[in-house]
Design a protein with these regions (language model features):
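Acidic glycine-/aspartate-rich tracts in secreted/extracellular proteins
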Residues: 53, 162, 336-338
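Acidic/polar, compositionally biased interaction segments
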Residues: 181, 188, 195-370
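Beta-strand elements within well-structured catalytic alpha/beta cores of enzymes
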Residues: 1-4, 44-46, 68-73, 158, ...
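Active-site-proximal N-terminal segment of extracellular/periplasmic enzymes that hydrolyze or transfer
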Residues: 168-176
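C-terminal cap/loop subdomain of S1 sulfatases and analogous C-terminal strand-loop tails that border
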Residues: 8-38, 53-57, 66-156, 160, ...
Length: 370
């Protein structure tokens, strides 16, 4: 394996014999460290597990570092944590790519400077201004925008599987995908204080639900003593019961040691900045985790004290979620050892809304909500 020099970081400011183009670690791609072109982002991975992984396999499936936590949890036979953004890559690694769950491939990076003008790079990529960069993969295609000063700036769209040098921008032929990429780029992230970006106050679009929706949230009950809130979508054992509840509730009959997943939509009444709050029962071991779209909304898992109220802010720093009016997919995971004494309360605060419990009328579900 050739030595790796972090994408060939440019060393023009160095005095000496360094030549960042010597190894051409960017390969057949353009870009170096700090670029969001493929040459600055893509990292090859070698995996060896003779007992499970067939030798000689090559996979071009894109993944990110967060997928490896999920993968190693899967290998160890423990639940993939809900607070992990990743999905297990074990199906792909073991030759069952048809069973691979889709994951989130997303990145943003703000750094001054520009792509160097290496002779191997395409003319239109040489000298490209970096600034605020953002990438997102949707339907196997990569969206990339650089020098972003407006959250509505269009993505360049590339088929990196067949065009790793990103020579052909497909954006003009894919307006519908452009809109989905913009939505995905906002709905899978949270503002990261103290860093500030132009995306932080951009309104996350509501979803256009196909078909009718029905009142309440779907629930699924999983028996087990869970050490943390799992991503139940990746839990191998089936639910022991399921149904619909008018509002967030985990008081289902079954084993005292259980996990409950609630899925559906929450209807945001008005465009603006919202803060959410969650409280569980006070029973030992009670934990919860909430996602809105793909973003982490509330973490009442790590270091959580049962019965305490946790908000969607970052500790004592305000960090509201900016949402468009309409339906937004919500996923709530809960684990506890308290049976029907379990409790879950979800509140909100926003435009024209003082802090109060979210009414049952705001929750709904569709056929695809589970």
């Amino acid at each position: 394996m050739a030595p790796h020099n972090e994408g060939g970081a440019d060393s023009r400011h160095w005095h000496g014999a360094q030549n960042p183009q010597f190894f051409k670690s960017y390969g057949m791609m353009d870009g170096i460290k700090r670029d969001c072109w493929e040459g600055g982002m893509r990292v090859p991975t070698l995996v060896r597990w003779p007992a499970r992984i067939p030798k000689g396999q090559i996979s071009l499936h894109p993944g990110q570092f967060h997928d490896w936590l999920a993968t190693l949890a899967d290998v160890a036979g423990v639940p993939v944590p809900a607070r992990s953004d990743g999905v297990s890559l074990l199906p792909t690694l073991t030759g069952h790519a048809d069973q691979q769950k889709p994951g989130i491939v997303y990145a943003e990076y703000n750094f001054a400077g520009k792509t160097p003008e290496y002779k191997d790079f395409l003319g239109e990529h040489k000298g490209a201004q970096r600034g605020q960069q953002q990438i997102v993969f949707v339907d196997g295609l990569k969206g990339l925008r650089m020098g972003v000063k407006d959250a509505d700036k269009d993505f360049m769209i590339f088929d990196t599987l067949n065009d790793p040098q990103e020579s052909k921008d497909l954006a003009s032929s894919k307006p519908e995908l452009q809109a989905r990429m913009k939505a995905a780029a906002l709905s899978n992230r949270r503002a990261s204080l103290p860093s500030k970006t132009v995306f932080d106050s951009a309104l996350v679009p509501a979803v256009d639900v196909k078909g009718t929706v029905s009142p309440g949230l779907r629930w699924a009950l999983y028996e087990g003593d869970f050490p943390w809130v799992p991503d139940f979508r990746q839990w191998k054992k089936p639910a022991s019961a399921h149904g619909v509840t008018p509002s967030p509730s985990v008081k289902m009959n079954g084993s005292d040691k259980r996990g409950v997943e609630l899925t559906g939509y929450v209807k945001i009444p008005e465009d603006g900045a919202y803060t959410f709050y969650l409280t569980t029962d006070e029973n030992k071991g009670s934990k919860a985790f909430v996602r809105l779209h793909g973003m982490e909304l509330i973490d009442a898992d790590k270091t959580y004290e049962p019965g305490a109220e946790v908000s969607s802010d970052l500790g004592d720093r305000k960090n509201p979620v900016y949402l468009k009016a309409g339906l937004h997919p919500i996923r709530i995971g809960y684990v506890g050892n308290s049976g029907t004494a379990s409790k879950l309360v979800l509140k909100w605060e926003g435009p024209g809304l003082s802090k109060k419990e979210i009414p049952a009328s705001a929750f709904s579900h569709g056929k695809e909500s589970r």
